[in-house]
Regions:
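Generic recognition of flexible, low-complexity loop/linker segments
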Residues: 163-167, 174, 256-262, 286-287
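Short, well-ordered alpha-helical scaffold segments within catalytic/effector domains
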Residues: 160, 183, 253-257, 282-285
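Extended, H/D-rich, highly charged conserved domains that either
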Residues: 2-251
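SIR2/sirtuin-family catalytic core signature
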Residues: 1, 259-355
């Protein structure tokens, strides 16, 4: 990503201690080099990585995906560039993006999978059962749920009719965990629910699985075919421009078809748990949200607390604003999103480290 000839400095004890104790990101590395600029310099070998670090609003992986698409559009629309120069720049951008993607995989393996226990740990019942109430099957007999407010009057009456007329076996709840995470962390939720016989459970790792290099590689790229510039990119008739669009990776296995089969099969409620609903998944989320069988969208938001444990803000509004971008029909969006008074913060689980 970048190179620095700092070897001439680290022989100095003071510089060596400074490097070890205070340099832990790119900004502190730049500061270190400025203090010893007579001896060393910094040169980037990956311009995409440089742009990531120069952006002050890159906080999530979706921001990196958005930045990739932005740079792809800049190259595509630059009238001063000849066609061959555009192709060359896109080839370089794709190679640099691949480097960042490989670093993402390495980070997740080293800092998550190899470091934390992702399995259910005996004796940690309080932690692992925080999600039980959230993932309980919908039931008109559950007085804690305000189903008549989370659904339209018509849908609620239909729910009541179903519970009155269907047998216990046919009235089982269905849970489809659409996992956008690359690790197995989300599987903890399903393992807890394995104790619940009234819930039929399925896991769909729609963005791939870390370590699976065959049928289900991680799908890190961009997925907004609704963007007004996508048709321009598509019409260039060069597959290099489409290399990192998620739709083509979805077709490498059956996960996407399994999702479509499910949403076509019956009415459903969407629970948003930890997903920012950013534009990089716009095509997929539009398919889910605007589908006629999607009857309700319930957001579990994140709270930020001060040092005294008092909530100072949450991201409910930010999430529903992001959700709105996936709707062509805004009236439909307002009808489906469950209002904040009926939603709740997403439980936070502290994973234990491996020993």
């Amino acid at each position: 990503m970048f190179t620095s000839n700092i070897s001439g400095v680290v022989n100095n004890y003071q510089a060596k201690e400074h490097l070890k104790q205070n340099v832990n990101n790119l900004e502190t590395l730049k500061g270190f080099i400025s203090n010893y600029e007579r001896y060393c310099s910094l040169e980037f070998t990956n311009n995409f990585f440089l742009n990531i670090n120069n952006k002050i609003n890159v906080e999530k992986w979706v921001d990196i995906e958005n930045l990739y698409f932005y740079q792809l559009k800049v190259i595509t629309k630059l009238s001063s560039l000849k066609l061959e120069d555009k192709k060359r720049q896109v080839k370089v951008l794709n190679a640099e993006f691949e480097e960042v993607k490989n670093l993402l995989e390495k980070y997740l393996k080293d800092k998550v999978v190899d470091l934390y226990n992702l399995e259910l740990i005996q004796g940690s019942d309080l932690e692992q059962f925080k999600f039980c109430d959230i993932l309980r099957p919908i039931s008109i007999f559950n007085e804690e749920l305000s189903l008549e407010q989370e659904f339209s009057v018509f849908d609620y009456e239909e729910l009541k009719d179903d519970f009155e007329t269907l047998s216990a076996e046919k009235s089982k709840g269905f849970l489809r965990l659409l996992n956008f995470n690359y690790t197995g962390t989300a599987l903890r939720y399903l393992r807890v629910q394995n104790l619940n016989d009234d819930l039929e459970k399925t896991h769909i790792p729609i963005h791939g699985a870390l370590g699976d290099l065959n049928d289900n590689k991680i799908n890190f790229g961009f997925g907004d075919e609704m963007d007004e510039d996508y048709k321009l990119i598509e019409n260039l008739d060069d597959n290099k421009y489409l290399r990192n669009f998620k739709s083509f990776q979805y077709l490498q296995n059956s996960n996407y078809k399994n999702l479509l089969d499910y949403i076509d099969s019956a009415k459903y409620q969407v629970l948003i748990m930890g997903h920012s609903c950013g534009l990089s998944d716009r095509t997929l989320l539009n398919t889910i949200f605007e589908h006629v069988n999607c009857r309700s969208i319930k957001v579990f938001f994140h709270e930020t607390k001060d040092e005294k444990g008092i909530v100072i803000k949450d991201n409910y509004t930010e999430i529903i604003q992001n959700i709105s971008r996936h709707f062509n029909k805004k009236k439909l969006m307002r009808e489906k999103i469950v209002n904040k008074t009926l939603c709740q913060p997403l439980p936070q689980i502290q994973l234990s480290k491996k020993v």
